[in-house]
Amino acid sequence: MPTINQLVRQGRTVEKINSKSPAMQNSPQRRGVCTRVYTTTPKKPNSALRKVAKVRLTNGFEVISYIGGEGHNLQEHSVVLVRGGRVKDLPGVRYHIVRGSLDLQGVKDRKQSRSKYGAKRPKKA
């Protein structure tokens, strides 16, 4: 417990909280251009080929972001919308690409959780 005199001399230090998605700069989403679209393998207990893209954002940051859902139409120079949110089993992937926005199409034939994958409501038969 410091004395009043010690507090007057030094004051309290405020703990700095580091952002989990610094490239967003406090924005909910950012637009960017794909510089590389590729697959990568997850950390130890899991096994798959996860689809990721390296994206150059409008603020100059270059980030690796995850492409969720089954199948995609992304290639180099595609314009995408990036949101925060990491992928636990892919080190260095701290962002997601928003499906159904800009150049990235929604997931085809998706029936459940459609809003997360940019899928339109299916037509009644």
Swiss-Prot record:
Name the record gives this protein: Small ribosomal subunit protein uS12
Subunit (UniProt): Part of the 30S ribosomal subunit. Contacts proteins S8 and S17. May interact with IF1 in the 30S initiation complex.
PANTHER family reported in the protein's UniProt record: 30S RIBOSOMAL PROTEIN S12 FAMILY MEMBER
GO CC terms, sorted: small ribosomal subunit
Disordered: annotated segments: 106-125
GO terms assigned for molecular function: rRNA binding; structural constituent of ribosome; tRNA binding
Chain intervals with Basic residues compositional bias: 113-125
The species this protein was found in: Variovorax paradoxus (strain S110)
Record flagged with keyword RNA-binding: yes
Superkingdom of source: Bacteria
Keyword RNA-binding: yes
